[in-house]
């Protein structure tokens, strides 16, 4: 590292080390004297001398030891002299959790203040010895990015469109172009510079290209995009260094391992990213200080040395990052995911930021990092980042959606992007001047950032026009961009870009040229530790698998019980082979669960891989190696339970040989399924790919169809099937035992019984085939793991693209044509220069709403209702993590005696810092909590709240926008309206109401857009948020709860949403919103405020007043609370003034002050008044629980499910392709064997073919339907809680939707298999084949749906379903015929659905065949009809009961699905 070591040493040459140390110690002492002033100077002098000696000793250490050894200050209590600051020598690589926490608590009491102090000291230390820090300047010149995409209806993912797209892509590969795609220009010829040491804010409306610009600068653009122009770092092109290691892109999507804690997540990130140049900097710094005789301050030295310590599992930098991001309070809480409670959304967003800033990277591109955070937390985080940028000369470009004015003022430079063009880039101080030159001015009580995001929009621009000399005309973005170039800031930027960056000026340590900054050994160790941790957290998964295999082993051992087994003839040997075969298959299937686990982990892996945390092999190797112990355990369990119980060859050597094969089968299967997961990458495709692969190795393993019978065109596949070797090895190991080889096949035969059996199964006779099998399985395991690693390395996640349906579509047509939309957008054009939302106050709400026009769409009648609640408390069971830390209480209280009221026509804001209990309170009041303990009184207009009736008159907009992904925006609203509006409202009226609500929230241009999955496809975050609100508004509720309706929105979108909310309130509805970081105008759109502090306590409840004067006056009335600065956001000031830091500073508890205030007494009186019903009022009553009757609910649910299924090609198309592939495989492998009736073996092969087809198509149907049902179930929980419908109509509609798709699947499957296998072409036989296949596929599908309804998530459903695959297989009648099943298990044969399927298929095809066939073991020849009756127990006249039972299984599984959907709720809130 180039730190100019040839500079002359600083300081006088004759200064002694001892004197230098003394000076420095006395300097350090003065700095800490304020804190520890109680100690005497005499004692402090002694301490100084001791400390000086310690520093002298450290200076004498070898460099390696010296750079990891320092002094740590600690407070020591002394009875004589009081608290003393003592120092102890520590090794920074061995700091324990307590030491790290003490240091952080002592040095960083108030995060932003102490952060600046320590960083200033750190910078002064570096500057003192003349070291220049490495910096990065990022330039982009003439950058243009384009994408090709489908538009309109062609962009919808219907089955038809997907088939067309696949066909066009295939033709495109051979040069035939049919596809007509639109070209979208995302960024258009933009140029600029991101400078080090300056905070740069990226602003722009949604879809303006902000994320694309950040990704481009970070070198992470999708390769399918067309890019032109140059991006350079310090003059280097992106291909000349490693941009993904030099810079870090912090995504707006939060992808984390849900079962890791916050601290574990950041520690792992810190280990993978390493320390970068910190160690080299420290080394050079220490050398120069030693030469100059300079002694560092202890806290700075410890911080720098701990930050530069490589290979530590728990880094001090992690504790520092947790502190400055405000995550220290939840550091030991798991992050959580969709189905597992963890940290809040805002905290999760901070974890995403912390994951990157914990590393050494100083060039950060941060994408909307404040979503879900309150404004004071955002300010604190941005303030700390600003200090890092200014004092460490970092390079930061950050996009924020709604930066408060005080946060906006922290930035030095602004980049404003709109429609893919740069409108302005330069100093913050000049940006308003630029727009004033056009005639636009930012109003006084309007945040500059909000103004900037609205002023370029056609719908919002006019209200800011202030030029009285000329009339307003719309100024397009292109004109702003053009005029910027001639503006003095733009000219300066152009001049700067005209001079190329001088590479010699750049520090060579600024850029990273190595792909990984940590040694491969250390990366492997980090991934190993993480994998081991995840195994411990996933203990249930491994215990479940082991218990599952023990249960199946117990069933198997009692089914093939040794007392019932003989070794007399070939028939007996076949039973042993059946047991071996089942054991092989069950241990193969055991690996199937690995696939679901791996698919769920891939998104986080791809993120970390692309951030160059670690190479793929360091992920795959620990996964493989740590899977070995669980395989040994499961294999041992299987062998111990089955081997001697069944009565296999009693030699100990054969026991251990079979154990080795079973273990290798498990390892091979787990490796194979991990490979399939990494290649397929989504659960639906992986389930199909897994089943298809399993079918291939299953069919061609030599046991369903002996080697000699396999058609020539499939002969090669026999040798590449792992099960070939597994089967050969198992059979050879058993059949070469003396008990088989010491007997003749029959009394008149010269062939040994074992040899005869091997001949019949076409297995090789050589003993060495056992070791060939072992070697082959080892090779397959190694091969699959290598391919798994390669797939992880080179394949990218399967991303779906949204169709191009521009938000500003046909804007010219909109202007002047749609008065309602124009009035909503401008909120009265006559008030130019004023803030529309700010004017929507208590006194002028009706005036500012623009008259009745704005209320169009909210005119359906409703009853205004008030809600009052008194002394509401909420408890949950004490989390295990807290009990582990010594907390003795059994319950954790989240709400502490909350009292208040929400009234009609009054818009109430529910505010507080993250973790204050805002969402918890709303969930409790709305009746959305599924667990915990609620106390207190909640009333609706004086009557006790009854949840069933309350759901009919209330709406709840959740913080997470949960919608069915495959329907359009308009369809989502139609569905909500038709189910929730009263029956008396006609269809036309409902449709009109839906259209009006769409206009109200400005979704009309997106009416035909697919909703999609968040972060994957479909609507953007802000569009999804507006849809959530619209879905509730179309229900026409009296009371509406909105959980952070503006979170994740930019200022313009937030204003649109709040206009819709305000219009809703002005109709007389009761509306309550939790809100995190409101701008001034949005905050002052509210009428009343309920403010909460952490711990679930109210600290203010009352009116805001004009310009928020009432809430400001309330807090300013307390002694010590500073006055609000001029033009400061009152929401931010209020949160700061009442923060925990402020309470500590003032030594007050604002909750206690509120409880003692007159305001609290007035609220108590109001609640008391509202708790008594008005005279003559009656309680809420509805004749029925739901708006629609059961038939109406069913029709609506079926309508939505139909569209969902039609637009789910990754489900329906994938299973259709799988069934087609299975049909062709079965047909080509068992080509025309249906007509072979010479011996019993031919019949066994046919049964094997039909059994395999039904099992594999059925299992595929089961596994592919699970993700579909799981996604829709999450939506179902929201819709049922909203009172849309009951569970039964929903469940029956989903069951009904499967019928036509399974019918299509069955018809073409039957035609292909029936013809290619060569069954008899008789109408009756073909009908029964189709009938049995149809109901078999159907019951498998419903079985998959049932398993999801019984379990909390898809992963557990997959494991649960697979638990019964083995039992269904075992009792199917293939491995052990019914007459051979012991009497104590025969009952299960009759309740096994697969057994009835095999029964029906065989009887329908062979029950009337009188052809005589040769029977094994020298028995007399029988007719086919007699043979299947004697050997399998299949009676030809039993087809009627078979048909009835198959229908019964189908109905039973569907019923259990519906019943569980109705009764079980796995959502934890």
From Swiss-Prot:
Query: Sorted alphabetically, which SMART domains does this protein's record hold?
Result: AAA
Q: What is the lineage of its organism?
A: Eukaryota, Viridiplantae, Streptophyta, Embryophyta, Tracheophyta
The residues that cross the membrane are 540-560, 575-595, 621-641, 659-679, 685-705, 713-733, 772-792, 1216-1236, 1239-1259, 1299-1319, 1326-1346, 1356-1376, 1384-1404, 1441-1461
Which residues are modified to N-acetylmethionine?
1
What effect on the protein does mutating residue 704 to F have, as reported in its record? In pen3-5; slight overaccumulation in leaves of 4-O-beta-D-glucosyl-indol-3-yl formamide (4OGlcI3F) upon Blumeria graminis conidiospore inoculation, a pathogen-inducible tryptophan-derived compound, which biosynthesis is dependent on the PEN2 metabolic pathway
What is one cellular component GO term in this UniProt entry?
endoplasmic reticulum membrane
InterPro entries (alphabetical) = AAA+_ATPase, ABC2_TM, ABC_trans_N, ABC_transporter-like_ATP-bd, ABCG_dom, ABCG_PDR_1, ABCG_PDR_2, P-loop_NTPase
Membrane topology listed for this record: Multi-pass membrane protein
Q: What happens when the gene is disrupted?
A: Defects in efflux of the auxin precursor indole-3-butyric acid (IBA) associated with developmental defects such as abnormally long root hairs, increased lateral root production and larger cotyledon expansion. Reduced thymidine and coumarin (e.g. scopolin) exudation in the rhizosphere. Overaccumulation in leaves of 4-O-beta-D-glucosyl-indol-3-yl formamide (4OGlcI3F) upon Blumeria graminis conidiospore inoculation, a pathogen-inducible tryptophan-derived compound, which biosynthesis is dependent on the PEN2 metabolic pathway. Reduced shoot fresh weight.
Q: Name one GO molecular function term.
A: mRNA binding
Site Required for preinvasive defense to nonadapted powdery mildews but not for salicylic acid (SA)- and microbe-associated molecular patterns (MAMPs)- dependent defense against host-adapted pathogens. Necessary to prevent the sensitivity to IBA (an auxin precursor): list residues: 1357
UniProt KW Endoplasmic reticulum keyword: yes
Q: Which positions are annotated as binding ATP 1?
A: 204-211
Q: What induces it?
A: Induced by cycloheximide (CHX), cold/dark treatment, cadmium, lead, sclareol and sclareolide. Repressed by abscisic acid (ABA). Induced by infection of avirulent and virulent bacterial pathogens (Pseudomonas syringae pv. tomato with or without avrRpt2, avrRpm1 or avrRps4, respectively) and fungal pathogens (e.g. Colletotrichum gloeosporioides).
- The protein, known as: ABC transporter G family member 36
Q: Where is the ABC transmembrane type-2 domain?
A: 522-735, 1192-1406
Q: Where is this site: Required for both preinvasive defense to nonadapted powdery mildews and salicylic acid (SA)-, microbe-associated molecular patterns (MAMPs)- dependent defense against host-adapted pathogens, and defense responses toward necrotrophic pathogens. Necessary to prevent the sensitivity to IBA (an auxin precursor)?
A: 354, 915
One Pfam family, please name it: ABC2_membrane
């Amino acid at each position: 590292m180039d730190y100019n070591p040839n500079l002359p040493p600083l300081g006088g040459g004759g200064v002694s080390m001892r004197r230098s140390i003394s000076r420095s110690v006395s300097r350090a002492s003065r700095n800490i004297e304020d804190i520890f002033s109680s100690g005497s100077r005499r004692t402090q002098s002694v301490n100084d001398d001791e400390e000086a000696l310690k520093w002298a000793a450290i200076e004498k250490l070898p460099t390696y030891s010296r750079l990891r050894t320092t002094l740590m200050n600690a407070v020591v209590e002394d009875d004589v002299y009081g608290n003393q600051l003592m120092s102890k020598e520590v090794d920074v690589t061995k700091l324990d959790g307590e030491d790290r926490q003490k240091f952080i608590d002592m040095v960083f009491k108030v995060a932003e203040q102490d952060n600046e102090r320590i960083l200033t000291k750190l910078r002064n230390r570096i500057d003192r010895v003349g070291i220049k820090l490495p910096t990065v300047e990022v330039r982009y010149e003439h950058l243009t990015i384009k994408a090709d995409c489908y538009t309109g209806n062609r962009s919808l993912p219907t089955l038809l469109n997907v088939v067309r797209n696949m066909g066009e892509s295939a033709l495109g590969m051979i040069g035939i172009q049919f596809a007509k795609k639109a070209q979208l220009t995302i960024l258009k010829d933009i140029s600029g510079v991101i400078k080090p040491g300056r905070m740069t804010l990226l602003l722009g409306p949604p879809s303006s290209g902000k994320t694309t610009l950040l990704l481009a600068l970070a070198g992470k653009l999708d390769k399918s995009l067309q890019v032109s122009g140059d991006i350079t770092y310090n003059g280097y092109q992106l291909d000349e260094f490693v941009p993904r290691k030099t810079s870090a892109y912090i995504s707006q999507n939060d992808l984390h391992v849900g079962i890791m804690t916050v601290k574990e997540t950041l520690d792992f990130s810190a280990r993978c990213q390493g320390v970068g140049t910190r160690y080299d900097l420290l080394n050079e710094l220490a050398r120069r200080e030693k030469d100059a005789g300079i002694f560092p301050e202890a806290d700075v030295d410890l911080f720098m040395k701990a930050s530069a310590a490589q290979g530590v599992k728990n880094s001090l930098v992690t504790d520092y990052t947790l502190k400055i991001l405000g995550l220290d309070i939840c550091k030991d809480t798991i992050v959580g995911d969709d189905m597992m409670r963890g940290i809040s959304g805002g905290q999760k967003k901070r974890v995403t930021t912390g994951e990157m800033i914990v590393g050494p990277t100083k060039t950060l591109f941060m994408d909307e990092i404040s979503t879900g955070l309150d404004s004071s937390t955002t300010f604190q985080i941005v303030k700390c980042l600003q200090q890092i940028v200014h004092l460490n000369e970092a390079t930061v470009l950050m996009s924020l959606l709604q930066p408060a004015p005080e946060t906006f003022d922290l930035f030095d430079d602004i980049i404003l992007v709109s429609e893919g063009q740069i409108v302005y880039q330069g100093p913050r101080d000049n940006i308003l001047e630029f727009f004033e030159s056009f005639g636009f001015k930012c109003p006084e009580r309007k945040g500059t950032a909000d103004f900037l995001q609205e002023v370029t929009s056609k719908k919002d621009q006019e209200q800011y026009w202030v030029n009285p000399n000329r009339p307003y005309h719309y100024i397009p973005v292109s004109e702003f961009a053009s005029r910027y170039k001639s503006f003095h800031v733009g000219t300066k930027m152009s001049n700067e870009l005209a001079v190329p960056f001088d590479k010699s000026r750049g520090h060579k340590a600024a850029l990273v040229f190595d792909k990984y900054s940590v040694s491969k050994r250390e990366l492997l160790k980090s991934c190993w530790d993480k994998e081991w941790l995840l195994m411990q957290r996933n203990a249930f998964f491994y215990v479940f698998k082991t218990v599952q295999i023990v249960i199946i082993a117990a069933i198997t051992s009692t089914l093939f019980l040794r007392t019932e087994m003989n070794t007399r003839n070939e028939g007996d040997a076949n039973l042993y082979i059946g047991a071996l075969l089942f054991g092989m298959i069950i241990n193969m299937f055991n690996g199937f669960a690995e696939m679901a686990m791996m698919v769920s982990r891939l998104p986080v892996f791809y993120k970390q891989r692309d951030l160059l945390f670690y190479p793929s092999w360091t992920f795959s190797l620990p996964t493989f190696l740590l899977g070995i112990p669980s395989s040994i355990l499961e294999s041992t369990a299987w062998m111990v339970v089955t081997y001697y119980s069944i009565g296999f060859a009693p030699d100990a050597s054969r026991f251990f040989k079979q154990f080795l094969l079973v273990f290798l089968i498990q390892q091979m299967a787990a490796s194979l399924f991990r490979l399939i997961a990494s290649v397929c990458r989504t659960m639906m495709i992986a389930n199909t790919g897994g089943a298809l692969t399993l079918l291939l190795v299953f069919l061609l393993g030599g046991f369903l169809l002996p080697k000699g019978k396999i058609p020539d065109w499939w002969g090669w596949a026999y040798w590449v099937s792992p099960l070939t070797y597994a089967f050969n090895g198992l059979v050879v190991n058993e059949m070469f035992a003396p008990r088989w080889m010491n007997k003749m096949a029959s009394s008149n035969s010269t062939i040994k019984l074992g040899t005869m059996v091997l001949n019949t199964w076409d297995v090789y006779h050589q003993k060495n085939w056992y070791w060939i099998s072992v070697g082959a399985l080892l090779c397959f395991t190694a091969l699959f793991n290598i391919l798994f690693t390669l797939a992880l390395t080179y394949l990218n996640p399967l991303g779906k693209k949204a169709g191009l349906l521009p938000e500003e579509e046909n804007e010219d047509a909109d202007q002047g044509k749609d008065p309602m939309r124009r009035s909503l957008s401008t909120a009265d054009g006559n008030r130019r220069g004023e803030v529309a939302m700010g004017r929507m106050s208590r006194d002028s709400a009706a005036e500012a709403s623009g008259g009745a026009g704005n209320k169009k769409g909210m005119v359906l009648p409703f009853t205004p209702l008030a809600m009052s609640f008194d002394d509401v408390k909420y408890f949950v069971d004490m989390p295990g993590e807290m009990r582990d830390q010594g907390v003795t209480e059994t319950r954790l209280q989240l709400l502490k005696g909350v009292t208040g009221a929400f009234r009609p026509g009054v818009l109430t804001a529910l505010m507080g810092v993250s973790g204050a209990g805002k969402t918890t309170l709303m969930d409790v009041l709305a009746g959305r909590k599924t667990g915990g303990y609620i106390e207190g009184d909640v009333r609706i207009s004086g009557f006790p709240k009854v949840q069933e009736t309350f759901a009919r008159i209330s709406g709840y907009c959740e913080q997470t926008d949960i919608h069915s992904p495959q329907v359009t925006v308009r369809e989502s609203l139609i569905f909500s309206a038709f189910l929730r509006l009263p029956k008396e409202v006609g269809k036309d009226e409902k449709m009109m109401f839906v259209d009006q609500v769409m206009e109200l929230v400005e979704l009309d241009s997106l009416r035909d857009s697919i909703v999609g999955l968040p972060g994957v496809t479909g609507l953007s975050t802000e569009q999804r948020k507006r849809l959530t609100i619209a879905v509730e508004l179309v229900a026409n509720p009296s009371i509406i709860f909105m959980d952070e309706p503006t979170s994740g929105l930019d200022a313009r979108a937030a204003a649109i949403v709040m206009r819709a909310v305000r219009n809703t309130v002005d109709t007389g509805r009761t509306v309550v919103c939790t809100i995190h970081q409101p701008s001034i105008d949005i905050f002052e759109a509210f009428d009343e405020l309920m403010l909460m502090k952490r711990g679930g306590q109210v600290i203010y409840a009352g009116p805001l007043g004009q310009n928020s004067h009432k809430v400001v006056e309330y807090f300013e009335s307390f002694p010590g609370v500073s006055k609000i600065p001029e033009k400061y956001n009152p929401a931010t000031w209020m949160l700061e003034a009442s923060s925990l830091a402020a309470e500590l500073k003032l030594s007050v508890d604002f909750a206690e002050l509120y409880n003692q205030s007159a305001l609290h007494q007035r609220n108590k009186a109001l609640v008391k008044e509202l708790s008594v019903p008005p005279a003559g009022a009656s309680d809420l009553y509805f004749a029925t629980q739901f708006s629609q009757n059961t038939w109406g609910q069913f029709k609506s649910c079926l309508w939505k499910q139909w569209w969902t299924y039609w637009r789910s090609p990754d489900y329906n198309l994938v299973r259709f392709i799988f069934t087609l592939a299975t049909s062709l495989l079965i047909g080509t492998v068992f080509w025309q064997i249906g007509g072979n009736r010479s011996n019993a073996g031919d019949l066994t092969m046919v049964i094997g073919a039909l059994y395999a087809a039904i099992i594999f198509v059925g299992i595929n149907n089961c596994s592919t339907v699970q993700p579909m049902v799981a996604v829709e179930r999450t939506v179902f929980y929201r819709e049922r809680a909203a009172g849309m419908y009951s569970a039964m109509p929903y469940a029956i509609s989903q069951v009904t939707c499967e019928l036509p798709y399974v019918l299509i699947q069955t018809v073409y499957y039957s035609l292909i298999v029936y013809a290619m296998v060569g069954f008899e072409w008789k109408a009756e036989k073909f009908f029964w084949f189709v009938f049995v296949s149809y109901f078999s596929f159907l019951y498998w599908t419903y079985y998959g749906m049932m398993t999801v309804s019984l379990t909390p998530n898809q992963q557990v459903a997959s494991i649960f379903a697979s638990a019964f695959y083995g039992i269904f297989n075992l009792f199917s009648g293939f491995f052990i015929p019914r007459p051979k099943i012991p009497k104590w298990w025969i009952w299960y044969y009759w309740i096994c659905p697969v057994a009835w399927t095999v029964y029906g298929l065989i009887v329908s095809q062979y029950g009337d065949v009188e052809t005589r066939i040769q029977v094994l073991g020298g028995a007399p020849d029988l007719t086919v009809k007699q043979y299947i009756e004697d050997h399998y127990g299949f009676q030809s006249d039993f087809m009627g009961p078979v048909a009835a039972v198959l229908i019964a299984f189908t109905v039973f599984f569907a019923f259990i699905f519906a019943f569980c959907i109705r009764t079980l709720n796995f959502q934890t809130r």
